[in-house]
Swiss-Prot record:
It comes from Neisseria meningitidis serogroup B (strain ATCC BAA-335 / MC58). Belongs to the TRAFAC class TrmE-Era-EngA-EngB-Septin-like GTPase superfamily. EngA (Der) GTPase family. The gene is der. Residues 350-434 form the KH-like domain. GTP 1 binds at residues 9-16, 56-60, 119-122. This is GTPase Der. Residues 3-167, 176-349 form the EngA-type G domain. The lineage of its organism: Bacteria, Pseudomonadati, Pseudomonadota, Betaproteobacteria, Neisseriales.
Length: 485
């Protein structure tokens, strides 16, 4: 599992700026696709060979007892519980504040390692900036600049040093490894119990039970499977905003380790933004996806039609996924769900022959040429497979930068139908053939044309005539001498 790093601190100390630096992006983890909820609180990062997850917790005002700031403080404390390491960010320009001292007191009570980072330290004397923050008793401060990157690498390198090198991903297994993901209280734990055929206690409120996903190997109808149990993220009692928010972290970690994700929805509730966000993580990671709409037996026919319309409207970007309407409690629809898991796994791990890929590409071009972009028309020559889980098709040609998104969607649907890629995302990459003379400096220089005057041409012509006449005379003389002998 990737270690999770939580960014904690007062408002306006630069947590979002540091988050963007650590994730190397200014956008959300989820692509800006229609229907996907943008979420700037979670992101991926990597230093060397070590990947990590980072959480931007929002501003922490511990002295507020109610309102939105109080909720943000609750979410921050939840982040500390869920994280593997905590970066406590303070403002080097403002200096030490009473709120910083209160936050530090709470962080010292946590068993998680805490790293004190003095932000906005660009251009200043590091020793002077760090001096007053030793009062927080959180070890040596790291003086950094989230905006310019100063000192950030050393901070993250020290954090990750305590975590082992990542092992080979579980997604490389030769059988389906699937994760049950979704919001709290949608029936994930019930579905896990129905799948395994036994009651398992997975909702204990004990330290550790909500932190690590459990990998369980089992067989069903003679076929091996591995399930990643993330149901332990749910806590007893009321599921508040903080718990629901951090269920996303569990989904991210589980999706990374799986090759198939099973997204569980609650038919008794409307499709929430969080559902779309979690689905977006699976799509971003390129994992095969199966959707289980749970508690289907407990709603009326009218409600069923409403749920289907809601799904079509809010999750239409999952048109490649198979939807199953099940009852985990009564174990209805589980067999069909497993058939789709196996099919999605097979599609994600498919090996496509290059000749067939190219034939499908040429057939698609014959049916519909790519539209021109100004005076340029893209020319696609051949294609081959570039990867699995998800399948990647690499198209080679010229002027491929001019291919529109709509034509890419057309090609995606064509390849999906030709290879029966049900349940997995399909990615198309364009590889433009390079012109060796693209730069003017590299072009071979043509010889300049010589201008020859008319008089020079006449002189040359007369000279050739005289030469020819002299040759004829010599020939006649030599022939006469030969016969005279």
């Amino acid at each position: 599992m990737k270690p999770t790093i939580a960014l904690v601190g007062r408002p306006n100390v630069g947590k979002s700026t540091l988050f963007n630096r650590l994730t190397r992006t200014k956008d959300a983890l989820v692509h800006d696709l229609p229907g996907l909820t943008r979420d700037r609180h979670y992101g991926h990062g990597k230093v060397g060979s070590k990947p990590y997850l980072v959480i931007d917790t929002g501003g922490f005002e511990p002295v507020v007892d109610s309102g939105i700031l109080h909720e943000m403080a609750k979410q921050t404390l939840q982040a500390v519980d869920e994280a593997d390491a905590v970066v406590f960010l303070v403002d080097g320009r403002t200096g030490l504040t009473p709120q910083d001292k209160i936050i530090a007191d709470r962080l010292r009570q946590s068993p998680r390692p805490v790293y004190l980072a003095v932000n906005k330290g660009e251009g200043g004397n590091r020793a002077v900036l760090a001096a007053e923050f030793y009062e927080l008793a959180l070890g040596d401060p790291y003086v950094i600049s989230g905006a310019h990157g100063d000192g950030v690498y050393y901070l993250i390198e020290d954090i990750l040093e305590k975590f082992p090198e990542p092992e080979a991903e579980e997604a490389d297994a030769r059988h389906p490894v699937f994760a049950v993901i979704g919001r709290p209280n949608v029936g994930k734990s019930t579905l896990v119990n129905a799948i395994l055929g036994e009651e398992r206690v997975i909702t204990f409120d004990m330290a550790g039970t909500t932190r690590d996903s459990i990998h369980i190997d089992f067989e069903r109808e003679g076929k091996p499977f591995t399930i990643i149990d993330t149901a332990g993220v749910r806590r007893r009692g009321k599921v508040d905003e903080a718990v629901e928010k951090f269920s996303v972290i569990k989904a991210m970690q589980a999706v990374e380790a799986a090759n198939v994700a099973v997204l569980v929805l609650d038919a008794q509730q409307d499709i929430a933004d969080q559902d779309a966000t979690i689905a977006g993580f699976a799509l971003e990671a390129g994992r095969a996806l199966v959707v289980a709409v749970n508690k289907w037996d407990g709603i009326s026919e009218e409600r069923r039609e409403q749920v289907k319309r809601d799904i079509n409207r809010k999750l239409y970007f999952l048109d490649f996924a198979k939807f199953h309407f099940i009852s985990a409690l009564k174990e209805r629809g589980i067999d069909g769900l497993f058939d789709s898991i196996q099919a999605a796994y097979n599609a994600a791990m498919i090996k496509m022959p290059t000749p067939k890929i190219t034939r499908v590409l040429q057939s698609a071009i014959e049916r519909q040429q790519p539209p021109r972009a100004g005076l340029v028309r893209p020319k696609m020559r051949y294609a081959h497979q570039g990867g699995m889980n998800p399948p990647v098709i690499v198209v080679h040609g010229n002027s491929l930068h001019a291919i529109s998104d709509s034509y890419t969607r057309y090609l995606t649907q064509t390849f999906r139908k030709a290879f029966n890629l049900q349940g997995t995302p399909l990615r198309i990459q364009y590889n433009v053939s390079e012109n060796p003379y693209e730069n003017a400096e590299d072009k071979p220089k043509k010889k300049p044309l010589r201008r020859v005057s008319l008089s020079n041409r006449i002189e040359k012509r007369e000279g050739r005539k005289e030469e020819k006449n002299r040759f004829k005379k010599k020939t006649k003389v030599s022939v006469k001498k030969q016969f005279s002998k």
